[in-house]
Amino acid sequence: MEKRAYIEKIVVEGFKSYGTKRKEIPLGEGFIAVVGPNGAGKSNIGDAISFALGLSSAKALRAKNLSYLIFSKNGQKADHAYVEVHFKNLGAFPVEDEEVVISRKVSKDGRSIFKINGQVVRERDLKDFLAKAGIYETAYNVVYQGDIVKFLKMTPVERRKIIEEISGIGEYERKKEKALEELAEVELKIKEIDLILEEISNQLKRLKEEKEKLEKFKELQRIKRETEAKILLKEKEKLLKERERILNELSSLRESLEDITFQIQENEKELNERERLLKEVNEKIMPFKEKVGKFTAEIENAERSIKEKERELKESENRVKNLEELINNLLSDKENLEREVGTLQLELEKLKEEYKSLKEVEREKLRELEEEEERLKITFDEVKKLEEEKEKLTEKLNSLNKEKQELEIQRANLKNKIERIKEDINKLISEREEKIKEIKEKEQEIKRLKAIKKKEEEELRNLTQELNIYEKRLSEVRKKLEEVLKEKGAIEREVRSFSDVSDVFKDIKGVYGSVSELIRVKNPEHITAIEVAGGGRLKFIVVEDEEVAKECIQLAKRMNLGRFSFIPLNRVRVEERPLRYPRTKGAVDFAVNLVEYDPKFEKVVKFVFGDTLIVENFESAKAIGIGNYRMVTLEGELFEKSGVITGGAVKPSGELNKRYYEEELQRLNAEEEKLKNEESIIQKKIREIRNLISEKTALLKVSERKIEELSSEGLEQYEEKFKEKLENSKEYLKILEEKLLNVEDKLKELAEEIEYYEEKLNNLKLKEGDIKRHYSREGVEEKRREYSKVRKQVSEIEKSLNEIERELNKKTYELEYLEKEIQEKEREREYLTERIKSLKKEIENLILFKEKTLQEVKEAEVKVYDYIKQKEELEKEILNLKSKLGKLKIKEEELKEKIFEKEKNLKVLEEKIENLNEELKEYEDLKLGADEESIPKLKEKLKRVTEEIQKLGSVNFRAEEDYAEELKRFNDYKEKQQKLKEESKAIKKLIEETENKKRKVFLEAFNQINKSLKRIFSFLSPGGKAQMFLDNPEDPFSGGVQLTVKPRGKDVQYLEAMSGGEKTLAALSLIFALQEYKPSPFYYFDEVDAHLDEVNAKKVGELIREKSKEAQFIVVTLREVVTSFADKIVGVSARGGISEVFFLKNEGLEEIIKEA
């Protein structure tokens, strides 16, 4: 089913001439004619449609601005202008509703509101909505009064854009834009990789130098190691010789030492015997000594262990005791807290009752006590004062202890906070490193993107300049080509008007042609003068001989062609004389010298022109002398030698012009071909540049978007934020630490204060005890205790009543803290309880062991006494023998010292040799041959090599690995670059395919519309022709669409030269051709038939009637012949300046037309 729509009705309110009331103008399908007198408001129907659909500006609607569209006349003024256009939707609009209402309201301040079916929309959204139904921004379907020729006055590009819009190639444009954006993304990545590859290339160059430096370093190191190894081998050889000498000396010294050693051995045998006996005694003593020593050590260890374990036991028991007490207290506190939290309000009431009761008892007890004291004449003030002071001290201590507890909780909280802040600071510092790395990477990428953007912007500027140059050149070429084509057309017409007299004889052998055909005027300015100079002789036909002339004459007679003159080459005679003319100003030259010809026809040319002199003008001829020469001026005046002067208007015969025009035509054809080739080349270049500009523009948009995305936060901004966070954290940490110090100081002060008050309270208690003892002696103490007890209870209740509200707020927090504390203390108590059991067992075992060991020591000391006496006698004998041996050993020692010195030197040598061997192990991988160089020379060589190594400076020992890694990275990026280039190539291919499809769709639309245009115009103007052609068929989007019209009986002419009726027919033909390709839901024509005669108006009416079967036509007309074809006639009249609408039948039309 064909999709279409039409306007059912228009609703206006406060719009232009239609007054302030809401009015409906029914329209309907088919051909609707709108008629009425001039000024009645007919055109305002079309203005209302255009206004509501946003198809025209205020200027096009004949208003200064939109607020001028609001009705205002005779003091009446509407608040707004409002128009509704009701469409019957038969599938044209992309909604399911059968009725589509589009409305627009403009207020006095010029603001507009558009709506579709009651929903407010933007103007852009409305235009998109209308375009889907075939109502476009170009509004080719709306023709205002006197505006029909706008379709002819359109520039070729505007005409092309209408066809583009109707052909629906927008989808291809969107695909192309999307592909261009994808291409820009890929190209941007390629550019980034290009920069990275450039960076890597620089790195590779540097690393290659470092690698070569490392290789040189390694070579020098190899030479250095070889030289070092050779030096070590030479030094080892020297040390081996020295060792051999010392070994020989040692051999002699050792022989002397052996003799002394023998004497010493003999004396030592005897000494040994005594020492053996001493040893036996010692061995007998030793077990006892060892046993005693062992027992003593064990006893000491046991005592030490007992002390340590007893100390640990005592500490653990004390700690357990403290813990149990603390846990009991904590549990008690916990129970109290739990009970108090649950029953605090009830307890408060109970305490108040109890307080009231106790207060009464207190007063009674106080009265009894005072009576007793009065009886004993003892004042109770002092006791009461002590009681109050003690109570105050107790309260103060309780308050201080509570404050201490709160401070301890506060201290724990502060420590936790300090730890958390320190952790946060460490975390912040750790995160900073990662963030800085991330920001630096982003900054590097931004740097690359900005470099690419800068380069691309520069290239875009250059391309734009280049495009402007080429477009300017293209415009010049096209202008020049147009001039060439005009000139060529004029020349072609001139050439066609010529007829060669020699053509009838062209088949006869020996005929060369007319004189005019055989010569060529050198300068076009001389053509008129040469034609006059040659006169009728220029038409003479040149033949070979008289026989040929005879044959031609006979042919002319047979065919009754008229008379001809012939010049036989074998008979022509000329007078040979030198041609001289006075060298006077105004003389040009003899005519024979101003033409070109074949030397074969020289006599003919001289015969025709003789001695005729060409001069510039009449005055020049007079100056030379009339009658002296046969002369012709450039304007054609002829001066005969006889004095006869011939002149006046000269009508060119064209005999010479033909040759000139033919040559000029050849030149122009060549120039046309050249210009067309140049045009094609320039167009191709412009296409390439435009494609590049599109790619560069898309790439710049993508790079700008990426730079914006990456530029969220720079290193400087982050560092500022980091420093601020760090400083804030450190400041907060400092504040917390200061608070902690303050809390610690307060706790210290509280401890001192608590200690002071506790001591003071003890003193008061002692003083109170003295008084109470005095009272007890007097029988008052009992009453005093009763009173104190009651007084204490009252005080406690008062204290509870005062504190209960304050305590209630702390209970929950303290309860949580107590539970944690209890759990921790219970775990510690369990551990210590087990430890105490273990310690007690260990101590018990150690005491038993100690007692047993002491008993064994006593028994051993009795047995060892006799052995000690024998030991003392043997020690005396041994001392004498040792004295004798002393002298021998001194001599032995001297020898040994010498041997030792030698051995020491030998050892040093061997150590050196060993060290050299160790050092030489580092050079085991070297293959060294015999070297005759001395150590000094080798050291000199080593020094030289070392200096060369130092000259190399710092060496990158990872150069080879770095080079390999960077080369791999380079190759990886190269591979990525290749893949991206392939992707870019694929996208470009897609763009090209899309462009080809777009071109194909456009050309199909163009060809179909052009075909319809030819047919419709030939119908409206029989014998006439109209067609469109593309400026550039190969690339239609680089040029425009030209329109040529040839009305019946006329040549092709410029549109400006056509009559109003001809222009109307041409414009309507184009509109109907567009309508045939893609009909708009409606067409609005306002007096498009104004310039048409009756016949053409009738044809237009017939055509509209025919086309109205496919689309709605709303036509404002004053022509009865047009209206006669309408399906419905809407009449418009004006009463009191307000337009009214009514329906007419064709019979009432004539009257309306006459009124108009």
Curated annotation (Swiss-Prot):
Q: Which GO terms describe its cellular component?
A: chromosome; cytoplasm
Residues annotated to bind ATP: P37, N38, G39, A40, G41, K42, S43, N44
Where in or outside the cell it occurs: the entry states: Cytoplasm
Please indicate which superkingdom the organism of origin belongs to: Bacteria
Give the record's keywords alphabetically: ATP-binding, Coiled coil, Cytoplasm, DNA-binding, Nucleotide-binding
Keyword Methyltransferase carried by entry: no
Q: Which SUPFAM superfamilies match?
A: P-loop containing nucleoside triphosphate hydrolases (SSF52540), Smc hinge domain (SSF75553)
Instruction: Cite the GO molecular-function annotations of the record.
Output: ATP binding; ATP hydrolysis activity; DNA binding
Q: Anything noted about its domains?
A: Contains large globular domains required for ATP hydrolysis at each terminus and a third globular domain forming a flexible SMC hinge near the middle of the molecule. These domains are separated by coiled-coil structures.
Tell me the protein family, please. Belongs to the SMC family.
- Give the record's subunit note: Homodimer.
Name of the molecule in the record: Chromosome partition protein Smc
Native species: Aquifex aeolicus (strain VF5)
